[in-house]
Amino acid sequence: HFTDKPFKTGKWRTPDNIAAHRAWGRKIEWFESGEYEVAPFTDKVIYTRPIVLLADESTFSCAEDFCVDFLTMKRGRIVGAKTAGSSGNPLMVKLPGEGVALICTKQDFFPDGREYVGFGIDPDIEVKPSIEDIFQNNDPVLQAAIKTILQ
């Protein structure tokens, strides 16, 4: 609902786990998705006014996929801090003492092939709240976003 133009989505890959091949010492084989183009809605209202997307290190999984699509659509700027760099889709492994480990099972890319899993996505405008901001209930990220959208 944010664009009236088609755009390409990110690509991803995941190891093809063939136990016999692993036992034989073969290299990891990969299943790779292709990119595909998303067509805009033709029967719904499209919001075409300016947009600012807020993100930080707590942005991961499908929220990070949304950041990729948002940047690919060229609909606005990302304000905040670098994202977490994890596409989600985790394999859950139970650990002793009721612990759990989550292991990322796929590697995601921008449509142009740039990686963000393990690295994160850099914001266009980096703003991080300080401890003082938090104690004073001040939100410099939101303030920067408002300033950006009004320009």
Please report, for each region that a protein language model flagged, where it lies by residue.
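Structural recognition of the beta-strand scaffold that forms the well-ordered cores
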Residues: P50-A55, R77-G80, L102
